[in-house]
């Protein structure tokens, strides 16, 4: 397991992490506790400085005691810890999202704010292979395409997030802690099937593992293949878009589409000269990348395929709606994308 962590830190499975500061998201569970210990043991070898951040979401009566346990643990290691207490129910109401999403957003906002140098330092989370399997299945349920179906990134440079344990099984983390005589906390809400993630964990994954005891190994292989493909397509689409003619903020024959305070994005044109001769697979990935740059919201495969079919057939004036108030219009062989808030990657 130390080899896995060191491989990440040396850049074998992501951008190298040396001579920097890492802020560890410490819930007190087995995964984040093991992560903090491993990085603590490797800190001198890798030139790391460490701090931790614990969030009390205020949703359970045990949470205050868990925060105190995190303080005691970090004090014993000599690692600075920041504890934040939130009222997630109130945040969920203000943001008009579920409590799980509100807690996640608040956590990552606090972690990002804790980075001493956002351009050089890292947020480290304890996501493990079981979490990756849940993420893959939830993406499948939501209709994600390839290669996003492969699951969350191990290394997310744009958001400065590193998940060093992502390819490690949870039982190995628990065995590691047990060998050291280190205890951890169990969140009682993890036993509830209220959330989709827990239903995957308790119901679906055990069935798949019963059918194939190597299911988690297959998830690991799928992740690796997906991220090889993702790296290829990100490089390919970026090169294609950078070579395309500059996108106008106003398209002749259409209503003006300059920067809009409500949407935050100008029109982006994919000209016919760029699209002609490309394989359908590359066109679809260009569409997805343009939509991603224009803001949040998953592009449904059905709509992407319909847009591509309209372009191939030359059906000018055809308009397609995408999540996040974004549109795509076929006009004179070009495709004009409009609207949408500024882009932000998802975890």
UniProtKB/Swiss-Prot annotation:
| Sites where the protein binds ATP | 27-32
Q: Where in the cell is it found?
A: Cytoplasm
**Main site of residence?**
cytoplasm
Pfam short name (any one): ATP_bind_3
Q: Which GO terms describe its biological process?
A: tRNA modification
List GO terms (cellular component aspect).
cytoplasm
Which EC numbers does the record give? Answer: 6.3.4.19
User: Could you tell me which residues belong to the region Disordered?
Assistant: 243-263
Which key words are in the record? ATP-binding, Cytoplasm, Ligase, Nucleotide-binding, tRNA processing
- Top-level lineage group: Bacteria
InterPro entries reported for this sequence: Rossmann-like_a/b/a_fold, TilS/TtcA_N, tRNA_Ile_lys_synt, tRNA_Ile_lys_synt_N
Gene Ontology molecular function: any one: tRNA(Ile)-lysidine synthase activity
Catalyses:
cytidine(34) in tRNA(Ile2) + L-lysine + ATP = lysidine(34) in tRNA(Ile2) + AMP + diphosphate + H(+)
Query: What remark about domains does the record contain?
Result: The N-terminal region contains the highly conserved SGGXDS motif, predicted to be a P-loop motif involved in ATP binding.
Per the record, the similarity remark reads:
Belongs to the tRNA(Ile)-lysidine synthase family.
NCBIfam families named in the record: lysidine_TilS_N
Q: What does this protein do?
A: Ligates lysine onto the cytidine present at position 34 of the AUA codon-specific tRNA(Ile) that contains the anticodon CAU, in an ATP-dependent manner. Cytidine is converted to lysidine, thus changing the amino acid specificity of the tRNA from methionine to isoleucine.
Write the protein's name: tRNA(Ile)-lysidine synthase
Per the UniProt record, the source organism is Nitratidesulfovibrio vulgaris (strain ATCC 29579 / DSM 644 / CCUG 34227 / NCIMB 8303 / VKM B-1760 / Hildenborough)
Q: Gene name?
A: tilS
């Amino acid at each position: 397991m130390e080899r896995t962590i060191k491989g990440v830190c040396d850049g074998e499975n992501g951008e190298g992490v040396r001579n920097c500061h890492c802020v560890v998201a410490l819930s007190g569970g087995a995964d984040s506790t093991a992560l903090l210990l491993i990085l603590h043991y490797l800190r001198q070898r890798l030139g790391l400085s460490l701090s931790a951040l614990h969030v009390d979401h205020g949703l359970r009566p045990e949470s205050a005691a868990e925060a105190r346990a995190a303080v005691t643990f970090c004090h014993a290691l000599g690692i600075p810890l920041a504890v934040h207490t939130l009222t997630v129910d109130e945040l969920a109401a203000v943001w008009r999202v579920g409590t799980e999403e509100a807690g996640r957003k608040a956590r990552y906002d606090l972690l990002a704010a804790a980075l001493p140098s956002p351009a050089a330092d890292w947020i480290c989370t304890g996501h493990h292979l079981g979490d990756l399997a849940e993420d893959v299945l939830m993406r499948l349920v939501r209709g994600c395409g390839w290669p996003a179906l492969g699951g969350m990134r191990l290394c997310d440079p744009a958001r400065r997030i590193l998940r060093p344990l992502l390819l490690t099984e949870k039982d190995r983390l628990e065995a590691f802690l047990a060998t050291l005589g280190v205890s951890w906390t169990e969140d009682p809400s993890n036993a509830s099937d209220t959330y989709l993630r827990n239903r995957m964990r308790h119901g679906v994954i055990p069935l798949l593992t019963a059918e194939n005891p190597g299911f988690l190994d297959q998830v690991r292989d799928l992740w690796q293949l997906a991220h090889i493909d993702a790296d290829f397509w990100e490089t390919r689409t970026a090169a294609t878009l950078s070579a395309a003619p500059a996108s106008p903020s106003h398209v002749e024959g259409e209503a003006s589409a300059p920067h809009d305070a409500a949407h935050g994005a100008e029109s982006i044109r994919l000209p016919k000269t760029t699209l002609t001769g490309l394989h359908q697979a590359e066109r679809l990935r260009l569409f997805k990348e343009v939509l991603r740059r224009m803001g949040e919201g998953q592009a449904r495969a059905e709509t992407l395929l319909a847009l591509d079919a309209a372009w191939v057939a030359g059906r000018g004036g055809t308009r397609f709606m995408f999540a996040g108030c974004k549109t795509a219009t076929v006009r004179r062989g070009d495709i004009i994308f409009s609207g949408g808030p500024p882009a932000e990657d998802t975890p």
